[in-house]
């Protein structure tokens, strides 16, 4: 598992464009958002915390799904699965590697948002970092899972409108979930991104850890673990 993680990390260090997408792009997007709302800092506070979790989720989803698919199309996965490692260990290795990147990504985005851009949070910035990290890990898990159903990198990207966009629309970022049509609200209640946004809002509004925050974090973490298990089950050694 650690050998797989080390190999993936070494590959990433030789791909500066991917590193830029993972680490720099979320920071640039948060910075852009701050100056879009330059005349309304309260609006940045209200949306910035939520997007601090959403941006890492999206970037990790894209990079993980494409990177895993590339491993399969080049025959690397087939060779690795011939070893005694097993699918579960292989997925755990990928998750460990991209999880390490997620730590750097989330820490940098949180630090820039809070201490440089002035994101006003009532709770601890460390809790903000925790939710951002779990969101990035969820994006990693989703990327590993959907890569099993794509035959090309283009198809991997096509999963984004199906997997990410509905969650983005229903997570409560644009309107409170309780104000949605009852059917849409019910759907949003089972989508992990909804709890990611709720968790960020809990840190934004409350100085202490609340029961709702614990629930939100547990749902996001549990969803990531569940999707990782599904990814191990559906992992293919060859392109379908």
Task: Name the predicted role of every residue range.
Residues 2, 6-13, 17, 167, ...:
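Membrane-interacting alpha-helical segments
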Residues 3-78, 87-107, 113, 117-132, ...:
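Transmembrane helix-boundary elements of multi-pass transport/secretion proteins
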Residues 32-40, 150-190, 194:
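Transmembrane helix segments
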Residues 105, 109, 113, 143, ...:
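Juxtamembrane/transmembrane-helix interface segments of polytopic membrane transporters
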Residues 110, 195-205:
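Transmembrane alpha-helical segments of integral membrane proteins
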Residues 127-150, 168-171, 222-229:
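Hydrophobic alpha-helical transmembrane segments of polytopic membrane proteins
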């Amino acid at each position: 598992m650690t050998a797989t993680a080390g190999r993936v990390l070494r590959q990433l260090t030789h791909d500066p464009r991917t590193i830029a997408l993972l680490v720099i792009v979320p920071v640039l997007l948060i910075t852009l958002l701050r100056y879009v709302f330059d005349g309304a800092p309260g609006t940045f506070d209200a949306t910035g915390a939520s997007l601090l979790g959403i941006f890492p989720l999206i970037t990790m989803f894209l990079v993980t799904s494409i990177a895993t698919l590339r491993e399969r199309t080049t025959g690397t996965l087939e060779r690795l699965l011939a070893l005694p490692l097993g699918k579960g260990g292989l997925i755990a290795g990928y998750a460990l590697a991209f999880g390490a990147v997620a730590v750097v990504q989330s820490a940098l985005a949180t630090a820039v948002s809070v201490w440089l851009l002035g994101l006003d949070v009532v709770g601890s910035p460390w809790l903000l970092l925790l939710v951002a990290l779990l969101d990035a890990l969820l994006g990693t898990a989703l990327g590993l899972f959907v890569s099993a159903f794509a035959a090309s990198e283009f198809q991997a990207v096509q999963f984004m409108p199906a997997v990410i966009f509905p969650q983005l629309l229903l997570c409560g970022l644009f309107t409170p979930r309780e104000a949605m049509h009852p059917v849409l609200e019910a759907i949003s209640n089972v989508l992990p991104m909804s709890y990611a946004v709720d968790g960020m809002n809990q840190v934004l509004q409350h100085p202490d850890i609340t029961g709702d925050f614990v629930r939100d974090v547990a749902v996001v973490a549990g969803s990531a673990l569940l999707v990782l298990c599904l990814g191990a089950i559906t992992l293919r050694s060859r392109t379908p």
